[in-house]
Every structure is written in structure tokens, then in C-alpha cells.
């Protein structure tokens, strides 16, 4: 486990594969640490295992899930089993849009989870960080998020097509974590972004730094980075399991 300073604000990648996990990979999942407060952002398959490399489940403070697609929420069910039968925790806070509850309606979570439904424009304090959600351009209700602490801000696009602007998360993004699911040739075919579109969106938002995530297995990651850099006008980094950035 990694110790975290009281005033630190960081992002650690637990999984970044787009839509399905590649060999040895994991889908969307991130650990956002604001001081000593630990938030699990996205619960894609494979990410609960990686989460426990950094924080024991007894010390996890909350989970945030952007939408109902399985590559972003399926490990919630594993978390339920762990908390209910092994850790012994109740009323664990889980922030989700309404669609996640509808998708899991047939599951019986009892009092293990404290479901906190959020929607467009809503804000909440998670430890010392203020989180704000904005609806994106995706087939189901999907919420991008801004997490802000002590004048530093993380902007997370979640899944989105180009009809939504990262700038809707507000000015002053210290670090933008933006999906880049598509090859450039596939732009416009589905409601996702290419690396080029992600770079352009981050540039329009005035983000200081850009990290690409949700890259589909099989895509050329280095080509994606180069396309994003050309559009962003500054160096771009790629999300990978275990990478950590101070915000």
C-alpha cells in the first residue's frame, strides 16, 4: 500500500482498455486520492483487483460510476460480495446516474451500498474534493466529472462522442483524462472519440495536461498519442495500469 500526504491530489490508473479488456488488461478504473480520501472512479472489469494493490477495501471511501455499460460498472458486483461477506461494511457510498440503478435492478445489494444518484450539473463533496457531473454525448445517460481540490482540477470525459465539449467541465483543468476509443478512420461511426478528437477537445478546454484513456485493444497506442499531440499542441500521455499523476 502507498502512503498519501494530507494535501496530495492524485490519479492512479487501475484499468484503461476501451470497451473490453485486452490480454492481461482491465477496463476503465481509476483511484482518485484527495488527501487521505480514496475514491474508486469507474468499476470496469479487472479494476477491483488492481485497486487493492493501493488501498484496502476497509479504507476505500466511495465509488463513482459514469454510466451503465458493463465495461464501466461490472466490478461493483464483486465489490458488493467483498464488502457484504468478507469485509463487513454497510452503507458504502456509490455515486451513479439513474441508469446504473435501472441496469442493476434485479440485483439484491441490501444495505451494503448507499446509492447516491447524481445527474447533470449536480455537485457533491467527496472528502476534501468537490465533484461536479455533466452529461455527455453517449447512447445512455453518461456523466463526465470534474474533481477539484485546493485550486487543482481533474477533468474526466467518461464515454462521449464529439457533440459534447470537455470545456463544459469548466476552466482551469490541471489534468484532463479523455477517452480515445476510435481510430481516426472510424470517427463519426459511434458516440466515442478518436485520439485526434480528444486532443482537440482538451485544447479547446484549455487543459494543462492530457492523458488518453479507453483506447481499444488492438489500436496503435503510439499513433494515437501522436495524433492527440498534434491536435492538443503539447505532449500527451497514455493511461496504463499503475501509472500515477499528481494533479
How would you name each of these model-derived features?
Residues 1-12, 32-42, 149-152, 156:
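Metallo-beta-lactamase
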Residues 19-68, 74-84, 165-169, 198:
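Pre-active-site segment of Zn-dependent metallo-hydrolases
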Residues 20, 70-73, 103, 122, ...:
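Active-site environment of divalent metal-dependent phosphoester hydrolases
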Residues 28-32, 143-147, 245:
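Short beta-strand scaffold segments in enzyme catalytic cores
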Residues 90-99, 209-212:
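Short internal beta-strands
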Residues 116-172:
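Catalytic core of the metallo-beta-lactamase
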